[in-house]
């Protein structure tokens, strides 16, 4: 359960750093996979030992292809989460700034909002000259409190969305339900060949930066 006190400490920097490390790992794995494929193609001799060598190389290629796909998925899931955490950080800042600019409101550590309640009489509301100053002030304070509550709710809802989306993708990688049919021979193993609907500019930029020069060229000329 994500709480208000939790998200006040959220910061995307650690996830962004992890995404960059995973990008480097993907490049290394992809190179190893391509080297194994090249080694298999280079074996032209025949015989039992050569056949066994080819089988070993094919096995290594298959394993590295799977690793490339899984690391690519983990990388993009982490970048998506970092983007979401950045959203939450912005929403939390919006809440705290709103509370600071409305000094009658108190934003508590648990995300609840307090404000001074004023006793407003019927006379304050029905005076022939219009509602009294106390009545108007009380109404404005309550309106501001409700606005701050709404901002807190929005921040928490986004935090839950980010947390659940990242957890779902991690679970799929952990329990083996994540599937990817791409191989080292496709344009961008483990990654889509085009930016996906719903991606933020940050995700698109990271996806493009994650591609090797050969992958970029293959996508451009496709």
Where do the model's predicted regions map?
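N-terminal secretion-targeting helices of virulence/extracellular proteins
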Residues: 1-190, 194-206
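Glycosyltransferase catalytic domains, chiefly GT-A lineage
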Residues: 207-211
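Short, charge- and proline-biased low-complexity linear segments
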Residues: 35, 220-222
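Residues that cap or delimit alpha-helices
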Residues: 11, 200, 212-215, 222
